Amino acid sequence: MSRTLTPLLDRVCEPQDLRAFPESDLARLADELRAETIDVVSVTGGHLGAGLGVIELTVALHYVFNTPEDRIIWDVGHQAYPHKILTGRREKIRTLRQEGGLSGFTKRSESVYDPFGAGHSSTSISAGLGMAVASALKAEKRRNIVAVIGDGAMSAGMAYEAMNNAGALNARLIVVLNDNDMSIAPPTGAMSAHLARLVSRPAYRSLRERVKVLGEKLPKFFLDKARRSEEFARGFLVGGTLFEELGFYYVGPIDGHNLKHLLPVLKNVREYPTGPVLIHVVTHKGKGYAPAEASLDKYHGVNRFDIITGKQVKASSNVLPYTKVFSKALREEASYDDKIVAITAAMPTGTGLDFFAEKFPERMFDVGIAEQHAVTFAAGMACEGYKPFVAIYSTFLQRAYDQIIHDVSIQKLPVRFAIDRAGFVGADGATHAGSFDIVFLTTLPEFVVMAPSDEVELMHMVRTAAAYDQGPISFRYPRGEGIGMDLPQRGEILEIGKGRILHEGNRIALVCFGTRISEVLVAADELSAEGLSTTVADARFAKPLDKDLMRRLAREHEVLVTIEEGAIGGFGAHLLQFLAQEGLLEHGLKVRTLKLPDEYLNHGSQEKVLSRIGLDAVGIVNTVFSALGRKIRTVQRVRV
């Protein structure tokens, strides 16, 4: 179908063009921006619902504030596609989340209109406060700093830490609370809009401050009564008492889709000389696109789709994704053991725990965007004899590292960590890559670290974790599908710290930790065809290492190559340290480690990027050839 005409949007290259429009044109411009956003994501896939929910807010912010001199910080960045279209990136917007194209999140290196990069939630207020204080220290002319944060992100403690600090500093910071679940308070029509305009006027705020000064001279009894009366009135009408207690001047709630309500409030707040302000806007995810509005997840993250029907393009496959294999295995284990509980930090669908909750709703806990709390909550349950499984993306586990050490590992509490999206994740790029969990977990004493080579092994590791009560244990698995193995009804319990041999050879040893095993097996076939007898080992455990197996491989082979989808300092590094301590590097053994490069990998196709960095069969074969002094060449791919 032909694309929707966008005559107004076509005139906008950067926000200064937008600011030349009369206010009467902005609603039509917002409609065009919404149509363009829908069209873009229908082609690229990505996050749609959040962006559709902030179309009018995005237009209003760039219209009122002098970006990029004024700073707009988008929390998480899921909602920033319309922002990118308005800020000079429309020509490249259909490269979104593709290798060499635009990021799916805000990114400082991409545009001056992205003052702070994002991907994880709840960072915007802290970053904005830092910018506001820095601006004040430099004695710059008044610069507006605006942090836009969703109500979901407000469930994280970091947001309140920042607000508490901003209130204490009386910093000149504007926070826009995008309440897209109406979880705090709905707007109440004309009265709410009128009140928001009234209380946002500088004259009202100035009068309020003067009354406060005068009130300090009154007896405490009268002062308390006056304060409580105002708090009751404003809290009853607009729900802002909590934010006022944190030192913010509260305005709202207002309809975030009504430009006639948004513009005067933003203009009023723009003129405030001091103090932090919170503007509470209520929006609806997926606004203006019926399939998104009707969907339970509001099209939060989607594949390419048909605009007319909303039907997403999905590859047909009977192979289960690793996430579904995990959730199936955990639900099976829970049917045998009523002490098994599951914990997620606001990702029940992404981690597969929604499937677990269908059968055991009372044993699944979604704690919100609160990874630190999730881990210590699990530790508390472990203290009382329960078997908590914390299902979490590798990238988000980073946020709870102190809790992993202090609350779990030191106390040797049997918390189970199911680490999803391990390794390179593809289109979401550097902020979501699961690069570091092997490194930061294998450094912890007596912490068991596993990785399955396929989906059957994943089922074994779920059962192994359920049976292990001696301390913390983890297993990591990637985004995407398995390799199509027939799945048992239930996994088996593995012996802790024992790997396995998949193919016996006598010259080359390929030791894989994780799901690159299929590429390793292809490489082994190619090496064998070249006359290089090859052993393939599935390590299973990075910690504890299978020391007997590693000694044998080191003594019986000329070249040993480790393969893992993790950062420097992981499985290969631990194996090298062991070999050095054992004196196994002193008799001619050639060791090479294949891993993720020492850089932050940008978005792109999983298969293409992993091939480019050498974590495929071609890269493995060429690594062996290089170790042997053979000429590196392009290898014909053989699929098994």
UniProtKB/Swiss-Prot annotation:
The keyword Zinc-finger does not apply. Pathway: Metabolic intermediate biosynthesis; 1-deoxy-D-xylulose 5-phosphate biosynthesis; 1-deoxy-D-xylulose 5-phosphate from D-glyceraldehyde 3-phosphate and pyruvate: step 1/1. Transmembrane segments: none annotated. Thiamine diphosphate binds at H78, G119, H120, S121, G152, A153, N180, Y289, E371. Mg(2+) binds at D151, N180. Keywords: Isoprene biosynthesis, Magnesium, Metal-binding, Thiamine biosynthesis, Thiamine pyrophosphate, Transferase. GO terms for molecular function: 1-deoxy-D-xylulose-5-phosphate synthase activity; magnesium ion binding; thiamine pyrophosphate binding. Binds 1 Mg(2+) ion per subunit. Binds 1 thiamine pyrophosphate per subunit. It comes from the Bacteria. One of its GO terms (biological process) is thiamine biosynthetic process. It is an enzyme of class 2 (transferase). Coiled coil: none annotated. Homodimer. PANTHER family: 1-D-DEOXYXYLULOSE 5-PHOSPHATE SYNTHASE-RELATED, 1-DEOXY-D-XYLULOSE-5-PHOSPHATE SYNTHASE, CHLOROPLASTIC. This is 1-deoxy-D-xylulose-5-phosphate synthase.
